Amino acid sequence: MVVGSSTRRWDVRRRAKHARLEGTRKALGLSGKVIPTNKIGMAIDTLVMPGDRVVLEGNNQKQADFLSRALVNVDSERIHDLHMIMPSVSLPEHMDLFEKGIAKRLDFSYAGSQSLRIAQLLEDGQLEIGAIHTYVELYSRLYVDLIPNVVLVAAYAADREGNLYTGPSTEDTPALLEAAAFHDGVVIAQVNEIVDDPKDLKRVDIPGSWVDYVVKADRPFFIEPLFTRDPRQIKDAHILMAMMALKGIYAPHEVESLNHGIGFNTAAVELLLPTFGEELGIKGKVCRHWCLNPHPTLIPAIESGWVKSVHCFGGELGMEDYIAARPDVFFTGPDGSMRSNRAFCQMAGQYAVDMFVGSTLQMDPLGNSSTVTRVRLAGFGGAPNMGHDPHGRRHPTKAWLEMIPKPDPVARGKKLVVQMVETFQAGPKPTFVETLDAVPVAQKAGLPLAPVMIYGDDVTHVVTEEGIACLYRAESLEERKALVASVAGITDIGMAADPAVVKKLRFEKKLLRPEDLEINPAKANRSLLAAKSIADLVEWSGGLYNPPAKFRSW
């Protein structure tokens, strides 16, 4: 019996990594971990090989933009067919990699501003998509079948031994970096500052033994204030839906732990807590524990004593001083700055919260939703992760247990998954459609599955300006379709609703109109908002919130 092999090498990846590092050391004349700023191009040339799996940190907010500019300037004759793995595809140079033939395949979670270009490159055959993931799913695959050869990340500061301070914008960095650091991949970090004395780092978020090289970028890394919503853009329709949600969902189920999406609907909810929420008498019963980026619109609720804790996926530009001054609420280090962590916060949002509230671009008659349209391949970010019912959950809460429709000793509770949408998008484009655009997009792109963001069987409530459809109480697929149609307004789906069925659903309280909740739509206006402008949010914060220039009107 052959017990082992005397000829097979078991350290191929390690030897390959050492060869790359040695090649870089000789080519650049390095004696340590610091790459001179003006030699980053040479470093990339020696560290990245054709066909490599390359993780490029694109996050929701933080971007390794200096490294992406260096990568896009390589010779495509020498470096090509890269398999890019990016949580967030956010910068033009991310797509330039594919146009120039440097990269070929993409696995990602969210695209945002590059969604139109991804769709075009896909159609032109210049880009292949592996899959559109939720964040945790993508991180997880880095440890299974997408193990990276090279990881390019961003941090605020480093010392000469490679210790990194990632601070408020830690975001995805630990999850991305560890996959390479412990399986013989190369790790390069761009930083805003390199200090000589390790004691000059505010704290160490990533140990230097995980990092192969650091380079001072030509300018501070780009960060997008993605989760800042100007209260001036909140419309009466948003306020009406927020009032219905608070009275018809949050209050009766006593939802204490939750995640909000980034739309104006949820911003309205946050700004109604100190006003309409106080009127309802639900302070201390709802909205106490959050998995949330540090939304400026949550400031009035925090200052009013509604919020006990907030764990954050990432930072938010301008919120740094406010967060540092509220350590009882936010997770902060001994230096005072916040420690975000998207991987941990996504897990918390999956298993530890009772409710997810978000929006979508399209919803079909069964409640399936997607943000992928015929012209935009936006991806989903964390919505599929937080917007589904995790069957592995075992700890009970009132809200979770109340989603059990009928008593059963072995029944499982359910997370509340709420879709808050207007019946029409800007355009006007109907939100409710017979078939999601995701279906033909998948067929055209050769994807084996339509990129559905949230499946209808996970959705417990749909909220529109027409009312609340309590899908968790549907006793059949036909009844679920009837409930969706009952709140679809004057879309084709809504116009096909049977008035007799709608009347029955209202009688059974499976459908709640504003009047059923004793809410007068005429009173749903901006006077109810605790803050009506960015300037009001600054005032609520006691001057600690420092909004980015584009949000200032003074």
Predicted regions located by residue number:
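Conserved alpha/beta enzyme-core scaffold
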Residues: V2-W554
